[in-house]
Amino acid sequence: MENAKIKNMYDLSQSIAGEYLSQFTYPWEALKGISDFIKKLGPTLDPEIYEKRGENIWVAKSATVAPTACLNGPLIIDEDAEIRHCAFIRGSAIIGKGSVVGNSTEIKNDIIFNTVQVPHYNYVGDSILGYKSHMGAGSITSNVKSDKTLVVVKDSRDSGEEIETGLKKFGAMLG
C-alpha cells in the first residue's frame, strides 16, 4: 500500500518528529510511541529556544499559549505555534512550528507537523497531520470504531489491499 507509507505521505523535514517517524513504514505504527519519544526528546531541546513548563512539557519561547489553554504532558510545542483560548491538549502531542491549535480544540496523542491549522472546535486524537494540513471548524477525527474492533486501513485507489493496524484507536492521517 504505497499511498499510505510515511515516505509518500509526509515531508519529514517539516516536523521535529521527522527522525522518529522515519523508522516506521506506516503512520499508525508511530502512534503507540509518541509519549516515549517526547519524554526522550524533550530534555535534549535547546534551553535557549524551549522552556520546561511542567512535567514533560516543553514550549518554545516564541510560541503563544493562551492563559486559558490546558496543557498536559508529554508535550512539545514548537516555535511560533499558537495555542488559543480554551484549547485542551491532553498529552502525547507534538505541535509543529507555526501551527495553530484553536479555541475549544482538543488534541490527544498526535503529531502535528509545521504550519498546520486546527483552528477551532476540533477533536484530533491518535492522528498525524502533515505539513500545512488544515482542518475546518468542528472537524472530528473519531478515533474509535463503533463496533470496537481493530482498525483496518483499506486502499481503494490501488489494489483494494487491506492492512490491519492492530489499533483500536486511530484517528486520521492527513498528508
Positions of the model-derived regions?
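Flexible, glycine/small-residue-enriched loop-and-beta-strand segment within the central core
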Residues: G42, A69-L174
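A generic, residue-level signal for flexible/boundary positions that often mark functional hotspots
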Residues: S15, E51-R53, V65, I89, ...
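Terminal amphipathic alpha-helical/low-complexity segments used for targeting or macromolecular assembly
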Residues: M1-N56, K61
